[in-house]
Amino acid sequence: MQKKRIMIVSVICILLLTLCACGTKKQEKKADTVDFSSLSKTGSMELNYATQYSVDEYDGYKMITIVDDGRFLLIPEGVVVPQNIPEDVTVLQQPLDKTYLVSTSVMDLVRQIDAMSDIRLSGTKEDGWYVEEAREAMEEGDILYAGKYSAPDYEMILDEGCNLAIENTMIYHNPEVKEKLEELGIPVLVERSSYESHPLGRLEWIRLYGVLFDNCLLYTSDAADEL
């Protein structure tokens, strides 16, 4: 009788696993055919001071808009890239763990959200960093110098598999550099925190980096205020 019960339970488990597998396949098939036009806005990040960027949610994706820089569709790790994305939208696929950070002011914010491991390349030499952790990371080889904003080492950037370049508005003095990076398939995000009129608006850019580097705790304003 005991053996019979075990056999029945085993059969039920197999059936349940089969059903789950079928359901997963159906979900995967559905996910493989996501079209950008079918995405619906489901929410927005509430910003208290920053005016130079916004983040809107679309069915699990996030649309980041930077004033005078464009729109970026953030794709979570393991999630399919939607089809028919407009040409003016740049795709960012997480994890963004090979970032080329040129804007020096961003590093301290990245440090505060414990995301320095996502910075692989620097536009500042080791002795030019005022952020001690950045200097130490370069000493240990965790962050490599890849050239300043006006003369990046394209070969190194490609060899390291760079998946995001964060620049400041100085890049507009050398637009050919931005164009070259994009031509090589590297998305370029120009941060504009210096254009915020309110001092706390500049600090609120930390929440954007929380989104980019997948620190979901910073999505709410209350959590950001605790930093």
Regions found by a protein language model. Name each.
Residues N174-D214:
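Charged, glycine-enriched surface loops/patches
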Residues S10-L17:
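Hydrophobic helical h-region of N-terminal Sec-dependent signal peptides
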Residues K29-L39:
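Short Lys/Arg-enriched alpha/beta "domain-start" segment
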Residues L19-A21:
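C-terminal motif of bacterial Sec signal peptides marking the signal peptidase cleavage site
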Residues K62-L158, L164-I171:
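A short, structured surface patch at a secondary-structure boundary
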Residues Y219-L227:
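Conserved small/polar residues in nucleotide/adenosyl-binding loops
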Residues G23-K25:
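Bacterial signal peptide processing site
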Residues M1-V9:
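Bacterial N-terminal signal peptides that target proteins for export
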